[in-house]
A protein has these predicted regions:
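Hydrophobic/aromatic-lined pockets within catalytic cores
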Residues: 8, 101, 180
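C-terminal alpha-helical interaction appendages
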Residues: 156-191
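Conserved mixed alpha/beta catalytic, RNA-binding, or beta-rich assembly cores of soluble enzyme
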Residues: 58-165, 176
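Short C-terminal domain-edge/linker segments immediately following a structured domain
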Residues: 25-35, 127-133, 166-167
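Intrinsically disordered, low-complexity linker/loop segments enriched in Gly/Pro
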Residues: 1-91
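Short, surface-exposed loop/turn segments at secondary-structure boundaries that line and modulate
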Residues: 1-19, 146-165, 171
Length: 191
């Protein structure tokens, strides 16, 4: 099973006068999962209703290392160390590179999702439970400015900032440096 909650006044439509029910009460919907061909949920489906379902695409919503400085909340917040990123790219088969600031990294994870659109508009995705198997490798003498994700077909430079334009600009600069420094691109080709 997974569940989604709609928090009052949350997201871009939370203050909507057209849909006042989005700002009135906290509501929760529970979705059954159907196992896939392998007999497990990882390749199964999420049943929204009798007529609507979609593939389960599990990923880790919150993962990070202990921050380099004292922060208000490293689990719910975000920063160069990771945190509550809620990115579908934090999934099986992808390599996640994270800065390490302390001996032992003090890695943490949680907030497993069965699926999610492009963000958590309502404050939640399809929240679920599961088992996560990880392999860690320490890359010495490597300083990362932020979390990076290597997918089989793409590189993802992660950045969180407000306003959005600052995050996009900083992620672009980090991706440029990554392509130039690690992959030998010229700045023009990387851009």
């Amino acid at each position: 099973y997974s569940w989604v909650a709609v928090r009052p006044k949350r997201g871009p439509l939370g203050e909507s006068t057209r849909w006042p029910e989005l700002s009135s009460e906290y509501t929760t919907k529970i979705f059954p999962h159907t196992p896939g061909p392998s007999g497990i949920m990882q390749d199964g489906t999420l049943q929204f209703s009798d007529s609507i379902s979609w593939p389960i695409t599990p990923f880790i919503g919150t993962l990070g290392t202990a921050p380099d400085r004292e922060v208000r909340a490293s689990i719910d917040g975000q920063g160069a160390w990771g945190g509550n990123l809620d990115m579908r790219d934090a999934a099986a088969g992808n390599r996640i590179l994270m800065p390490v600031y302390h001996d032992g990294a003090l890695f943490y994870l949680g907030d497993l999702h069965a699926s999610q659109g492009d963000t958590e508009y309502t404050g939640t995705a399809a929240e679920t439970c599961g088992t996560v198997r990880l392999y860690f490798e320490l890359i010495k003498q490597k300083k990362l400015p932020f979390v990076r994700i290597e997918k089989p077909d793409a590189l993802v430079a992660v950045q969180t900032a407000r306003p959005l334009e600052v995050a996009v600009d900083t992620a672009t600069q980090h991706l440029m440096a990554w392509l130039v420094d690690d992959y030998g691109f010229t700045p023009t080709d990387a851009y």
